[in-house]
């Protein structure tokens, strides 16, 4: 019967939690559209009014 590796010591809560410190989710970055004030991702065309950088680029 094949033996498989097992942990020699129990992982502490501090070590376990430190390993998971990068797992947190970040909320999406949103900025108000200067034209219609709807929230949108930065550096993207506004899905509500179709403006980007002060001019109409998308017909909505």
Curated annotation (Swiss-Prot):
- The answer to whether the entry has keyword Zinc-finger is no
User: What's this protein's name?
Assistant: Large ribosomal subunit protein bL32
The region annotated as signal peptide is: none
| Sequence ranges of Basic residues compositional bias | 1-23
Q: What top-level branch of life does the organism fall under? A: Bacteria
> What is the primary gene name for this protein?
rpmF
Query: Where is it found, in Gene Ontology cellular component terms?
Result: large ribosomal subunit
The region called Disordered is annotated at: 1-30
Function of the protein: Found on the solvent side of the large subunit.
Q: Give GO terms: molecular function aspect only.
A: structural constituent of ribosome
Q: Which family does it belong to?
A: Belongs to the bacterial ribosomal protein bL32 family.
Task: Give the record's keywords alphabetically.
Answer: Ribonucleoprotein, Ribosomal protein
- Among the record's GO biological process terms, what is one? translation
Assembly state and interactors?
Part of the 50S ribosomal subunit.
